[in-house]
Amino acid sequence: MTPATRLAAPDKTRLVNESYANDEPLSVRIETHRRYSVPPVDLPAWALDRYAWRGDETVLDIGTGTGQYLAPLRERIPRGRIVGGDLAIGMLRDLRAKGVPGDARLLNADAEALPLADESCDAIIASYVLFFVPDIPRALAEAHRVLRPGGALLAVTMAHVYMDELRVVVNRALAKLDTSNETRWGVVPRRFTLESGLAYLEPNFHVTVHRHESALVFP
């Protein structure tokens, strides 16, 4: 058992119906990182460029959210098929209303039970999503099932110390409000980090780690 497995799993229903009922909260977080990350980074482009694309792959972006990976992915696989999957209907609705980038197909999909056939994808993108999945090993087993032999899982996450300073300040304030541990800010991302993720991945995948070091710096 890794230390991360002892952290409480998030409530899937609450995530879908509250935290990700629409795309506004996630859009704000993405824009915050775009404005204040030092050094600046186009994260989708950076992550996608860690892999050598042929140009004709079938790719699932699970937890697609605002669809920020779809357009840059299309640039890299002009002849490929792209599926943007998300458990949150509200996110898919907002994405469709704003126009789906990359001519992608949208799919209501649970990472723990992917509605896709065995060996149907060449690559799966899971960016900042695996720590939200209640049963991480099950989700990774599903990814392994859906991937073709030689396929790739691009699992993007943060380090364990992600925004530690801000987390301490926020949790001190929450403690004064007598909130429960369930509401402590910053706990969920620690379930699958750069450090703890290897223990989850190595049973089914050959793992290569790529690091991008940055910080949020506010004026």
Regions found by a protein language model. Name each.
Residues 112-123:
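A short acidic, Gly/Pro-enriched loop at the edge of an enzyme's catalytic core
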Residues 48, 71-74, 137-144:
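A structural alpha-helix within SAM-dependent methyltransferase catalytic domains
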Residues 58-113:
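Class I SAM-dependent methyltransferase SAM/SAH-binding core
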